[in-house]
């Protein structure tokens, strides 16, 4: 049995499903990739363990982005803009009673988190990024992006087989978790998870939106402490794009790990969690010191 699911209501009336787990000293908003279902996530043991570990040193806030999972579905032909989905992070924080938080974005959740950190600086205590990039499609000045042929083939495959064991095996083998090829337990969970996370039309609409993602221009405007995490052989997001993030976000710290799995909870999750915990605790210490200094000033005044 997973945590209780609640709903945040956005300014335009949409309902966003969210959960709050843990009682740590700092809030941590976890922004999932492409699609999600906050209740189905807890059914995968390794993913549940990863989330539980995050909740052991933070007050973890999970949510399904607008259009996927348990949040309000939208028309596949009129999908919300990237900026609208980014603003939903703030609505979830409001509903969860969070004034400021560390924002942790993975995969597609990365650019959403970057945009939030750049435009909502007072609410962003820190930023953690894993397995992501500021741009997704190939360009002459971004040779690590996916090619037009890749996008066409991917969309065609999704249209034919979204939510089937065949598609789940392909995801595991080609980019999600190559080290878990042959793991039918993972395939069975992923098959059901995809169906509960998004309809075929919604998944396709999201992928088309992802093809247009490019938030490189906002990177210099991110001033929150930032930790960038990446696996050196991630087949979905080459490490060169990860390094570019660390170079362009002022003061960002980069941590690279061996590994070829894109799914953050597969493989060397302990190393990722150790880095994340160290970073969050450093932020907590800084906040505590700032509070102490402010209290001293107020007392002496």
Model-predicted regions and their roles:
Residues 114, 118, 124-159:
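Flexible "cap/lid" loop of the alpha/beta hydrolase fold
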Residues 7-72:
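Conserved HGGG/HGGXW glycine-rich cap/lid loop of the alpha/beta-hydrolase fold
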Residues 257-270:
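Catalytic histidine-centered segment of alpha/beta-hydrolase-like enzymes
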Residues 222, 228-230:
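Short beta-strand/loop motif that positions the catalytic acidic residue
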Residues 161-209, 218:
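Conserved alpha/beta-hydrolase catalytic His-Asp/Glu region
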Residues 235-241:
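Conserved alpha/beta-hydrolase "acid-adjacent" motif
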């Amino acid at each position: 049995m997973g945590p209780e699911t609640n709903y945040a209501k956005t300014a335009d009336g949409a309902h966003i499903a969210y959960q709050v787990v843990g009682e740590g000293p700092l809030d941590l908003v976890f922004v999932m990739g492409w699609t999600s279902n906050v209740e189905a996530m807890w059914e995968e043991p390794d993913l549940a363990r990863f989330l539980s570990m995050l909740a052991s040193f933070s007050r973890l806030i999970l949510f399904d982005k607008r259009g996927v999972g348990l949040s309000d579905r939208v028309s596949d032909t009129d999908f919300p803009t990237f900026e609208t989905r980014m603003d939903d992070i703030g609505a979830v924080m409001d509903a969860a009673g969070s004034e400021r938080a560390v924002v942790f974005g993975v995969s597609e959740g990365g650019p959403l988190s970057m945009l939030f950190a750049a435009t909502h600086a007072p609410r962003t205590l820190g930023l953690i990024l894993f397995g992501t990039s500021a741009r997704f499609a190939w360009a002459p000045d971004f040779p690590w992006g996916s090619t037009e042929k890749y996008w066409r083939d991917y969309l065609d495959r999704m249209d034919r087989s979204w939510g089937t064991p065949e598609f789940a095996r392909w995801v595991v083998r080609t980019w999600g978790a190559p080290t878990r090829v042959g793991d039918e337990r993972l395939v069975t969970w992923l098959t059901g998870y995809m169906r509960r996370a998004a309809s075929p039309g919604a998944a396709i609409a999201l992928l088309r939106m992802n093809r247009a993602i490019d938030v490189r221009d906002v990177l210099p405007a991110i001033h929150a402490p930032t930790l960038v995490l990446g696996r050196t052989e991630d087949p979905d997001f080459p490490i060169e794009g990860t390094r570019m993030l660390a170079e362009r976000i002022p003061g960002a710290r980069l941590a690279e790990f061996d590994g070829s799995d894109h799914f953050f909870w597969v493989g060397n999750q302990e190393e990722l969690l150790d880095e994340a915990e160290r970073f969050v605790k450093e932020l907590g210490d800084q906040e505590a010191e700032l509070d102490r200094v402010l209290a001293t000033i107020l007392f002496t005044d």
